[in-house]
Swiss-Prot record:
It is an enzyme of class 3 (hydrolase). Putative catalytic component of the RNA exosome complex which has 3'->5' exoribonuclease activity and participates in a multitude of cellular RNA processing and degradation events. In the nucleus, the RNA exosome complex is involved in proper maturation of stable RNA species such as rRNA, snRNA and snoRNA, in the elimination of RNA processing by-products and non-coding 'pervasive' transcripts, such as antisense RNA species and promoter-upstream transcripts (PROMPTs), and of mRNAs with processing defects, thereby limiting or excluding their export to the cytoplasm. Its main location: cytoplasm. The lineage of its organism: Eukaryota, Metazoa, Chordata, Craniata, Vertebrata. Residues 372-438 form the CSD2 domain. One of its GO terms (molecular function) is 3'-5'-RNA exonuclease activity. Residues 64-182 form the PINc domain. SMART domains: PINc, RNB. The modification N-acetylmethionine is found at residue 1. This is Exosome complex exonuclease RRP44. It comes from Mus musculus. Belongs to the RNR ribonuclease family.
Length: 958
């Protein structure tokens, strides 16, 4: 059956075109009920249960299926995801609305419908001839969709009665729309609100905690006192932004001060890049990462950023008065040049709320169901939730979602989502850091796994088309110990003309991950593999990452090869790229490869190849450094785990060998060669990576630190910086050069992916290369998969597709990759920090030598080389006499009583674990040497204050 819709549309050129849309209706779409003989199993995929069970509702004691409307899916997804909610019919009408309004919720509901244990069934009511309806004259789209949902619910009930007359099976409409519910009841459709239905499930009282209360009736504060200004409607905000009255930007809350935030303005005007927001009323219920509209205050009301550290310790609505008292502390007299553009939030353009991890702060009122939740992320305000399981949730990590923030409430309202486990447990804390850094880590869905090759897999004749057979070459891989996702392998051999052939062979992941399918979409969403201390979150399923794509030894593998002909001076004479098949002759660790190179007794083909590669790598590195490439340093920690408990039993810095540098040089060379090739072929659509030069002010701390040791660091170019660092040696202080390079690393900007057609600056500052990309790690970086596809098209080994040559879509991919890469780094650091805490928890009190990296007004920041660990030694203690402190920003130095501390001075510190705040345990450091009366803590004396409950956070003045 065919319906068509005809309408006229005005074109951009001013013309008029006639549009005809065809809409096909069918009579063979299954209802999803196994008992239905009429549909004859026409439904495919996950279906409803024959006899719905485990839904003992006091309102509906008979067997039933649920049919939620759009708003229930959008706002009560936490309820629907609970294991007790099964046998749900999701209409096509509802899915389309959810998809248009919230991509994250749409993804979650798709995951639920793909879970066969949940028995969710998607019914395509818009193409069923019995349930499709036309929009009536004068009816808006929302009312039409509500009617379509009621029509489908009514059809289901009548249909099930016809096919199973003796069955009591019914379909219940779940809607929070009062008018929709009234109309449904009038039409004879069983209908309840989500709250009514959930409260009727007496066997699952915990479900009530998951309810999102959208109207603020349930969470109104009894006093009713208005605290915040009303948010302006979106139409007024858009008018104001267009006229210039308001500015649009991203709200960034402060970690250090809950009464302060900044708004990063969306636009090109540099002078309006950042607006300061100060004070609880000016923040006006904005939450970190929300897109907001701000009004710039008159210049007379501009303020300076506060140096005061303030944590929100309030418990009730009266705390607003305390907040206002605290705001007065922020307003201190400062010079005119310290003032910053200041504004106030007038409206919310887009909420970017997510589920938050944290802990419950149980109410002091006995039997109270309302409690405050304290998020782990200090940038998020406390959230008021209603729960009946407060006692069971004490001391545990939980997830809470925000529902809304009424004007008369000091805190937003939310609901309990999930109990993650006990604070301090490894599994719990790992889950928290993954969730808090937005690292996708759910198991791969069946839809994704369906695109994997079937096992057993082998290379076919079809696979060999457009490929070179390089299995005869002596190829080997060199990686860290325990590496299973081997991306790259190398070879070097002498040619008959006396030159050398060098090959970098990279796993051909793009052969297995084809554009646009579910596997490709999931890989693009994840963006990168995340390496934690004890866990790896793969970007692609394990079958690919550790098996079919991994270039393991003695198995045939598909590769993408970059092959150079070089002379013995490492000068490139020819470069070619080819899809290939290789058979690695050895999977070596860096230590094993180094041993082969150094051993005079070993002269086999693999060792000869490694020696050739190593010699060329040294020449390549020398050439890069002469051009101005930077050799920086950062302390990397490696844990040794107990084989049974998996707790860290040793902590040491990572050891680097010549072979680390050897592999790095050829990966850099391959990336540069590929970048040139794809940019030649796709000048507007190449995915590249750039590293911006830091602004001169970034180097101030490095220049001052070097000056304190009578050394001069020049920073006008990367070459002058590299040369200065090379000359900065001290025979009496061999670690000085490493410290300078660590400081130089802190001065750098973040490298980012970008589309060549959207930017003119390609330069990579750190590598001193005019162009660069990522080609060598496609198992763990999605950027490399895109680069592989571009290169394959460039050499005629594969065909293109529309998205590959769409610079706007490529730019969006780059934004996601940059975000995922940054979040992965933060998650890795959080994992190291947690395992460091575990290590020192078991070690007790430890004293070690350290070097000062920074001096502050009331503290020194030190680095402990043995552990690669950084920490802060404070010199002001609460409830203790304050020492005489004199800070000099120019040198920089800090005088305490009679002792002066400079950057890079050697000290001895005591390291302990501060467990006074369960949610934010941290490593504390105290000075042991040099001796300062009233400051030092003898190395053999435990600092009980550090582990006593109720310890207050000390303020670090910058």
């Amino acid at each position: 059956m065919l319906r068509s819709k005809t309408f006229l549309k005005k074109t951009r050129a001013g013309g008029v075109v006639k549009i005809v849309r065809e809409h096909y209706l069918r009579d063979d779409i299954g209802c999803g009920a196994p008992a239905c003989s009429a549909c004859g199993g026409a439904h495919a995929g996950p279906a409803l249960e024959l006899q719905p069970r485990d839904q003992a509702s006091s309102l509906c004691p008979w067997p039933h299926y649920l049919l939620p409307d759009t708003n229930v899916l959008l706002h009560q997804i936490d309820v629907l995801e609970h294991p007790a909610i099964r046998n749900v019919i999701v209409l096509q009408t509802v899915m389309q609305e959810v998809r248009n309004r919230s991509a994250p919720i749409y993804k979650r509901i798709r995951d639920v419908t793909n879970n066969q244990e949940k028995h969710f069934y998607t019914f395509t009511n818009e193409h069923h001839k019995e349930t499709y309806i036309e929009q009536e004259q004068g009816e808006n789209a929302n009312d039409r969709n509500d009617r379509a949902i009621r029509v489908a619910a009514k059809w289901y009930n009548e249909h099930l009665k016809r096919v199973a007359a003796d069955s009591q099976l019914q379909v219940i409409l779940i809607t929070n729309d009062r008018k929709n519910k009234e109309k449904a009841v009038q039409e004879g459709i069983p209908a309840f609100t989500c709250e009514e239905y959930v409260k009727s499930l007496t066997a699952n009282p915990e479900l009530i905690d998951r309810l999102a209360y959208l109207s603020d009736e349930m969470n109104e504060i009894e006093s009713g006192k208005i605290i915040f200004s009303e948010h302006l409607p979106l139409s007024k905000l858009q008018q104001g932004i267009k006229s210039g009255s308001y500015l649009q930007g991203t709200f960034r809350a402060s970690r250090e001060n809950y009464l302060e935030a900044t708004v990063w303005i969306h636009g090109d005007k540099e002078e309006e890049k950042e607006i300061l927001i100060q004070g609880i009323k000016h923040l006006n219920r904005a939450v970190h990462e929300d897109i907001v509209a701000v009004e710039l205050l008159p210049r007379s009301q501009w303020v300076a950023p506060s140096s005061v550290v303030l944590d929100d310790e309030g418990q009730n609505e009266d705390d607003v008065e305390k907040d206002e008292e605290r705001e007065l502390l922020l307003k201190t007299a400062v010079s005119e040049k310290m003032l910053r553009p200041t504004g106030r939030v007038v409206g919310i353009i887009k909420r970017n709320w997510r589920p938050y991890c944290g802990m419950l702060s149980k109410s002091d009122i006995k039997e109270s169901r309302r409690h405050l939740f304290t998020p782990a992320d200090k940038r998020i305000p406390r959230i008021r939730i209603e729960t009946r399981q407060a006692s069971a949730l004490e001391g545990r990590r939980i997830i809470v979602a925000i529902d809304g923030w009424p004007r008369n409430s000091r805190y937003p309202n939310g609901h309990f989502v999930k109990n993650l486990g006990d604070v301090g447990e490894k599994e719990t804390e790992t889950e928290v850091l993954l969730l808090e850094h937005d690292v996708p880590h759910q198991p791969f869905s069946q839809a994704v796994l369906s695109f994997l090759p079937r096992m057993p897999w082998s290379i076919t004749e079809e696979d060999m088309k457009n490929r070179e057979d390089l299995r005869h070459l002596c190829v080997c891989s060199v990686d860290p110990p325990g590496c299973t996702d081997i991306d790259d392998a190398l070879h070097c051999r002498e040619l008959s003309n006396g030159n050398l052939e060098v090959g970098v062979h990279i796993a051909d992941v793009s052969h297995f991950i084809r554009p646009g399918n579910a596997l490709d979409q999931e890989s693009a969403r994840r963006g990168t593999t995340v390496y934690l201390c004890e866990k790896r979150i793969d970007m692609v399923p394990e079958l690919l990452s550790s098996n079919l794509c991994s270039l393991r030894s003695n198995v045939d593998r598909l590769a993408f090869s970059c092959i150079w002909e070089m002379n013995h001076n490492a000068e490139i004479l020819k470069t070619r790229f080819t899809k290939s098949v290789i058979n690695s002759k050895a999977s070596l660790t860096y230590a094993e490869a180094q041993m082969r190179i150094d051993s005079a007794a070993m002269n086999d083909d693999i060792t000869t190849s490694l020696r050739g590669l190593n010699q060329l790598a040294k020449i390549l590195k020398k050439g890069r450094i002469e051009k101005g490439a930077l050799t920086l340093s950062s302390p990397e920690i490696r844990f040794h785990m107990d084989s049974e408990t998996h707790d860290p039993i040793d902590l040491q810095t990572k050891e680097l060998r010549e072979t680390n540098s050897m592999v790095e040089e050829f990966m850099l060379l391959a990336n540069i060669s590929v970048a040139k090739k794809i940019h030649e072929e796709f000048s507007e659509h190449a995915l590249l990576r750039k590293h911006p030069a830091p602004p001169p002010s970034n180097y101030d701390i490095l220049v001052k630190a070097a000056k304190s040791k009578n050394l001069q660091i020049k920073t006008d170019t990367a070459k002058s910086l590299a040369d200065s660092l090379d000359r900065a040696e001290s025979p009496d202080f061999p670690y000085l050069n490493t410290l300078l390079r660590i400081l130089a690393t802190r001065c750098m900007m973040q490298a980012v992916y970008f589309c060549s057609g959207m930017d003119n600056d390609f330069h990579h500052y750190g590598l001193a290369s005019p162009i660069y990309t990522h080609f060598t790690s496609p198992i763990r970086r999605y950027a490399d998969i895109i680069v592989h596809r571009l290169l394959a098209v460039a050499i005629g080994a594969d065909c293109t597709y529309p998205e590959l040559t769409d610079k706007h879509k490529l730019s969006d991919i780059c934004k996601n990759l940059n975000f995922r890469h940054k979040m992965a780094q933060y998650a890795q650091r959080a994992s190291v920090a947690f395992h460091t805490q575990l290590f020192f928890k078991s070690k007790g009190i430890v004293s070690e030598e350290a070097y000062i990296l920074f001096v502050r007004k009331n503290a020194i920041v030190v680095l402990i080389p043995k552990y690669g660990l950084e920490g802060t030694v404070f010199f002001e203690e609460k409830d203790k006499p304050k020492p005489r402190l004199a800070y000099d920003d120019e040198i920089p130095s800090l005088r305490i009583e009679g002792t002066v501390f400079h950057v890079f001075d050697k000290v001895k510190v005591k390291i302990t674990l501060d467990s006074s705040n369960l949610q934010h345990q941290k490593i504390r450091m105290a000075l042991v040497e040099p001796q300062i009366p009233g400051i030092n803590i003898p190395p053999n004396v435990a600092d009980k204050a550090l582990t006593a409950p109720g310890g207050k956070k000390r303020k670090l003045e910058k």
